[in-house]
């Protein structure tokens, strides 16, 4: 039975547009003999593949990415183009050490390029299983030496790992946790990351400085720094930390987020144990601790994070208590209170009292409100179950102020001149901290607001 042709359209006079008439006639015959679907390669079907690839050279990465979604056939031809030497040379920019342009404009441009490239690979490999996607992408990216763990001779001046991280973040955005687990395992196998981490955390701190630096740069630039959602950052940080015992987790956390030398980027292990440090040196560690504490996952309980903070405070040896206090303050009220409450519950009241003294000292130095320390102490007092325990704790706080002042005074009397100047300034701040602390306690006791 012949097919019926729909004639509900405007007729065009034959003498005009003869080419259109021939196309209509041809189209009618096609319908009459059974409908044939248009090629998924569209109008590009008439072109040799060489011409199609030449056209791709004139398109931006974003445009090629959009084009890859037209059909499976087009996507496959784009994959083939990427695999060619000319395609990979054009798409895999390797200008990672160009410091000529001001205001880091070059950095921004190449990062945006690899963000777009990640989206292109995400779309082109959409129909492949995760394992096959990763194998194909690795095959293409293996040409870029600066993407490798030890690939760049000047890693501190290189944007390679940062671009690689931007690429991976765009590629894996929206993937479920199982797929992201596979990505992490693939990267670990590719770089032998677990073995390298084991060597770093089991060695004497600072004895493998180059390895520590490589681990820090790879973990930060590739796995952690590009995520916009905290839950994603927590997921990847958990993958890095969780395979290891708590003591190694603390060492690894310090390697990744601890203070580094501005000259060579190497981890500074002695900073926390030799002298008071600043907020900048501790901010990375504090942010990582908050990230794990706030993570809505069963993999990190509050007790886990507090234990990690406790372990961190003795890496590589016991920190100055002022640095420990500063880290707790930067980590936020919840973590600070939980840490102090843990000491109260475990009967470590003398340690807790000294910590209160140094919280007050940090408040004084940084011009924070001293009533924060007093209110934190008041909150911790409620953890003690009996009035006798509370009274004993408060007595320990008063004694701790006196003891720390005497320790600083002895340090001044026995030290050299330069040391004297720093110690005297620290003593000056502590005496003022004690005065302001007790002033706040008096206001609280007399129930008199400070503003009156």
UniProtKB/Swiss-Prot annotation:
<protein>
    <recommendedName>
        <fullName>F-box only protein 47</fullName>
    </recommendedName>
</protein>
<keyword id="KW-0833">Ubl conjugation pathway</keyword>
<dbReference type="InterPro" id="IPR056622">
    <property type="entry name" value="ARM_FBXO47"/>
</dbReference>
<comment type="function">
    <text>Probably recognizes and binds to some phosphorylated proteins and promotes their ubiquitination and degradation.</text>
</comment>
<dbReference type="InterPro" id="IPR001810">
    <property type="entry name" value="F-box_dom"/>
</dbReference>
<dbReference type="InterPro" id="IPR038946">
    <property type="entry name" value="FBXO47"/>
</dbReference>
<dbReference type="Pfam" id="PF00646">
    <property type="entry name" value="F-box"/>
</dbReference>
<dbReference type="Pfam" id="PF24467">
    <property type="entry name" value="ARM_FBXO47"/>
</dbReference>
<comment type="subunit">
    <text>Part of a SCF (SKP1-cullin-F-box) protein ligase complex.</text>
</comment>
<feature type="domain" description="F-box">
    <location>
        <begin position="41"/>
        <end position="91"/>
    </location>
</feature>
<dbReference type="InterPro" id="IPR036047">
    <property type="entry name" value="F-box-like_dom_sf"/>
</dbReference>
